[in-house]
Amino acid sequence: MRRFVIGQAKNLIDQSRRRQLHHHKNLSFVSLIPPFSAPSDSSSRHLSSSSSSDMSASDSSSSLPVTLDTINPKVIKCEYAVRGEIVNIAQKLQEDLKTNKDAYPFDEIIYCNIGNPQSLGQQPITFFREVLALCSYTALLDESATHGLFSSDSIERAWKILDQIPGRATGAYSHSQGIKGLRDAIADGIEARDGFPADPNDIFMTDGASPGVHMMMQLLITSEKDGILCPIPQYPLYSASIALHGGTLVPYYLDEASGWGLEISELKKQLEDARSKGITVRALAVINPGNPTGQVLSEENQRDVVKFCKQEGLVLLADEVYQENVYVPDKKFHSFKKVARSMGYGEKDLALVSFQSVSKGYYGECGKRGGYMEVTGFTSDVREQIYKMASVNLCSNISGQILASLIMSPPKPGDDSYESYIAEKDGILSSLARRAKTLEEALNKLEGVTCNRAEGAMYLFPCLHLPQKAIAAAEAEKTAPDNFYCKRLLKATGIVVVPGSGFRQVPGTWHFRCTILPQEDKIPAIVDRLTAFHQSFMDEFRD
């Protein structure tokens, strides 16, 4: 990988800034701006006193303007366990560790609760960040030294992208669906992946995949009589967004015994049951590869799902954000659009929305908030309403848009960055596969724990066969048994995982979700801590 010469880069930026400052000093209007005058001590005291009086008056009021009784009840109903109680406890422990290092049997909090790769040490892809840097600070493109610091293809790509942005400014608003040239690149990437045409006008760029999911829920749900079929266990975004928009989650249970299989008979059963209760089921959500379950659907299974949606008149919501995260040789990712087109289904046969994000895969750019949804099979008048919803949000952020285009159009053979890009990509994915295998094997060695094969995504979802005494202890604390286990695990080891009850599960079963994202050199220590804790827990509560 090319070494980035820090000193040269700093000098380059400083030179550019000095030129800009010299330019601004020559502008006559600068002298017209009055100097900032800080308030005097007396005025500060007056402001503070007035503020305190106002607050006291407000506090003494018998009627507060906002209470839990007066806010939208749908907000109270929605929950997001991935950042719930366990994480709140972890954050308090992390703060306390700064001043009370000897108070706990661990020296750090290890967050295995959320798919946030770079927070746990994963490095970004160099080519992606070079292009972002050049697009964000365009003055670098005018410096001769830039060619010694950045790859030639990142410079070329940055110029190409900037030419497509109004005013060549990444701080400007874009078209509500996203910059047209970037949507062209994404459509080309989809076509290269699937072997079927993709239309840039079907692409709606979003701040990660989550806003796209919310947008579709808002579009499809009119009342609690509208239902969305969701996999159980499910990613809490779905239950939360359905609750927030006032709909009904219609569960279909994945079969843990068959590696979290998706059975069409289960879909039919739950659909018929919902309809018998007067619920109009509008859509089927499928997460592939699975979150939190980590399974990868077979192409044959996907064909059955497509047929089911076609026969029942359901919108297929395909959450495909982990499409790059497949770790076993006998499984391969196939997009639902590719499967549908290979079956002969065209635009008029199936309403399909596919979601992609820059947060997952091998890139892990969660904080950049980039993603898109590809919307196909909707009538023109409905598409106009989707566009209107996108317009209300003005546009997604430009850096996220750029990244979304880059993950779908990375360096190709012969490009200056290709070899380093492939080395970084393969290094990350192969390491994730090793971590997944190590954790899977360790979990299956624990007493009363079973864990399905980690085929893809970023998670393991082991089943806890807890002793009755542990279940009774949890009931005494008025909490779910898996939540009880996870809290004890956190306080004993500093390891943060998410209780399975936060994802929903077959009644009477208990699980937790654990990411495979801590850096590879930390995995052995995590295994040791987890093993020691679990043995102690079972010794304490064994029937």
UniProtKB/Swiss-Prot annotation:
- Keywords noted in UniProt: Acetylation, Aminotransferase, Mitochondrion, Pyridoxal phosphate, Transferase, Transit peptide
Q: Name one GO molecular function term.
A: ATP binding
Inactivation phenotype = Strong overall decrease of alanine aminotransferase activity, especially in roots.
Q: Which residues carry this modification: N6-(pyridoxal phosphate)lysine?
A: 360
A GO cellular component entry from the record: nucleus
Transit peptide, from-to: 1-55
Write down the required cofactor(s): pyridoxal 5'-phosphate
SUPFAM superfamilies in the record: PLP-dependent transferases
The reply to whether Phosphoprotein figures as a keyword in the UniProt entry is: no
Tissue specificity, per the record, is:
Mostly expressed in roots and shoots, mostly in vascular tissues, and, to a lower extent, in flowers and leaves.
| Modification sites for N-acetylserine | 56
Q: Which family, according to the similarity comment?
A: Belongs to the class-I pyridoxal-phosphate-dependent aminotransferase family. Alanine aminotransferase subfamily.
Q: Which PANTHER family match?
A: ALANINE AMINOTRANSFERASE, ALANINE TRANSAMINASE
Q: What does this protein do?
A: Is the major alanine aminotransferase in roots that catalyzes the conversion of alanine to pyruvate. Involved in the rapid conversion of alanine to pyruvate during recovery from low-oxygen stress.
**Protein name listed in UniProt:** Alanine aminotransferase 1, mitochondrial
